[in-house]
Amino acid sequence: MLLDSLDITFLGHACFLLQSRGKRLLTDPYSPAIGYAPVDQFAGRVTLSHDNPKYHSCLDDVRADSVIRGLEHLGETMRSGPFQLHFIEVFERLPNDGPNAMTLIEVAGLRVLHMGDCGHLPTPAQTKACGRVDVLLALAGAGPTLKLPDLLRFVEAVGAKIVIPMHFGVPGLTMQIEPVETLERLWPFDVVTGESIYRVSRDEVTAMPLLRVLEPLRLRS
């Protein structure tokens, strides 16, 4: 029996295209003004962690059937095709400044967590709300988001086995944040680098955490 699979395409910054069973979900599209090429994608659904049209919620280059704003659905669970979505409240800064939504995406037997623009180590209650995480789309640039040692603590707390970095510094980016190599140096387990697209299924979830570094598809040449 063939297992369902999930294709994860890293477009750039915090924007991913997730595809399963012919359906497409896009997360946190950015504006090309930040230094990446335009997103230029179609998706049935787009999820937004918060309202930041420069870095996380630009819809100018996106064609979508509907947009789901996580902050309007905190604590709720909804289904969109093969994707089940649950939104967890965090903040850009503590205490309680800059509301933000982490998005838990259940698809193909996997639990995928997109960290949005979280700027702090999630509290025990927020971490508990995430439950088990198989694939973590992880904030890797430090700077305005959570510190990298806190990210490693969160990886351990949710039991994430596949960690895909996002929101890190690249040449030409208008935000001064750490490059992904900084996280690679801190990472205590295996690191695998690859192309922009990663196909994963439930049977690929390993016993030990793996850092899977994807090349941003929309990186300007």
Which ranges hold each PLM region?
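Divalent metal-coordination and catalytic microenvironments
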Residues: 18, 46, 85, 117, ...
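Binuclear metal-ion centers of metallo-dependent hydrolases, dominated by the metallo-beta-lactamase
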Residues: 8-11, 97, 162-221
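Active-site metal-binding motif and surrounding structural segment of the metallo-beta-lactamase
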Residues: 32-76, 128-137
